[in-house]
Amino acid sequence: MSSDQKLSTAEQALRDAANEYHRLPTRGKISVSPTKPLSNQRDLALAYSPGVAYPCLAIEKDPSLAFDYTSRGNLVAVITNGTAVLGLGDIGPLASKPVMEGKGCLFKKFAGVDVFDIELAERDPDKLIEIIAALEPTLGGINLEDIKAPECFYIEKQLSARMNIPVFHDDQHGTAIISSAALLNGLELVGKKIEEVKLAVSGAGAAAIACLDVMVGLGVKRENIFVCDSKGVIHADRTDKLDESKQRYQQHTSARTLADAVHGADVFLGCSAPGVLTADMVKTMAASPLILALANPEPEIRPEVAKAARPDCIIATGRSDYPNQVNN
């Protein structure tokens, strides 16, 4: 969704409410609060100098004690450079901060995990790796978020090998887990076998490729998967340079457009951009199609549009204001 896109009355109301929510009564959505009493001189002497020296010395002698004497064990960094924010694109690190704060809210509310959101003004993958790896003493885990493909695959792989704390790439692992669960449940509802379905995909970034890798592991046949990037179907006759992740899903096919790929498909997986799946495309899908339109905040097709075109479809989006929310 671009900032100059014409909004419906409902979207204008949502925009105004969201902006007000983020601005008042305090700016932003997260804060840092002490977990120990600070009510008198003794508390202050224990929290800082001179008492703080003793846990410092203990950790110097035995680094594992950092998990006893500091918040490290329950502290995760949500880290981005803002190059691939789902549904918004390359909006940069500063504009992505509300998304990272929002993810921090979810960690705290639903898992009790504390979060620092870290937005980095750096696009070079190797420099990002150095910066993030240097944060290891502070953190109990890393959650990579909204970093564009194919760099994100390299960054996650290098950090996982280098760091001694968990490194989770949300757009790969989180989206893959939840969308695969939706696929299994959706196919069960319509009585289709996973090894027989045709899957059309819009998007070939980190989220889409990770979803496909898991779905193939669950039984989707690779020859039944048709992936589209910004240039159309990823087919064997493409002359442009494809990264390794896209090459795995090249098809020997005459299909060239998303409309071609969607024709006769049992499942649509969208990890791309608003409005790319049209009602006319949905009409050409197989009986009881499953539509996973996961672009946020605006899906590849609105549920009401999909349902009007195909009343027999099951549609899920990444939005919380529609039924069947499927996102990471």
PLM regions and their residue ranges:
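Short helix/loop capping segments that flank catalytic or ligand/cofactor-binding pockets
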Residues: 56-57, 69, 86-89, 210, ...
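Rossmann-fold NAD(P)-binding glycine/threonine-rich loop
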Residues: 157, 275-327
